[in-house]
Amino acid sequence: MRRLRDYSLCLCLLLLWPLAVNADDSWRQIQTEAHGQTVWFNAWGGDPAVNRYLAWVSEEVKRYYAIDLRIVPVADAADAVKRIQTEAQAGRRQGGSVDLLWINGENFRTLKQANLLLTGWAESLPNWRYVDLQKPVREDFSVATEGAESPWGSAQLTFIARRGQTPQPPTSPQALLAFARAHPGSVTYPRPPDFTGTALLEQLLIALTD
């Protein structure tokens, strides 16, 4: 097996969120202001394990912080992005239907360029000290995050080969391209717009066009 890419799963806060978080606020003050509030978290709902985890998290934040975390499963984050844009265009600057969003790079860029994301909060999170800064966590889709996005997990794309048929599998993007050309139809991946397939092609394009 060969790992081809490391990518992050990121969360963003929307400017329509009713709780304003200032850079100089203490975390205790933020907790106090959040007490009793409802947070609408739009997240991809396609993974049963993640869904169970988020259900557990919602129970925990209710128990310990009196925050009502409402999980809104979405098939595509782009749908939530469109809803956010529509609400902003209608002049809804508070109490929007999306407070927290599990987002990918393309949708992050769209919202940030439209000035619809709250900035400056991510690195003030207590758990930011656990973030691996060797990874490109301060840039997404070639856009500086400016504290508007926090990674909450990571995953890796892995190349899997049958050793009996492929005793020396490719170990680089260049070798994978050469292998695919020499063995047409032998390399498979999820067809875009599947997220994993798109991520693979993005990584290969970046590596092969340097």
PLM features: what roles do these ranges have?
Residues S8-P18:
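Bacterial N-terminal signal peptides
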Residues W44-W56, V72-D79, Q94, V98-D210:
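Extracytoplasmic ligand-binding site segments that recognize negatively charged/polar headgroups
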Residues G36-T38, P184:
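A general structural motif
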Residues M1-L9:
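Bacterial N-terminal signal peptides that target proteins for export
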Residues I84-R93:
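Short, well-structured alpha-helical segments in soluble
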Residues W27-H35, N42, D47-D68, F159:
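Short, polar/charged alpha-helical segment
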Residues V21-A23:
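Boundary at the C-terminal end of the N-terminal hydrophobic targeting segment
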Residues R28-Q31, V81, Q85, P173-L177:
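Short hydrophobic/charged patches on amphipathic alpha-helices used for structural packing
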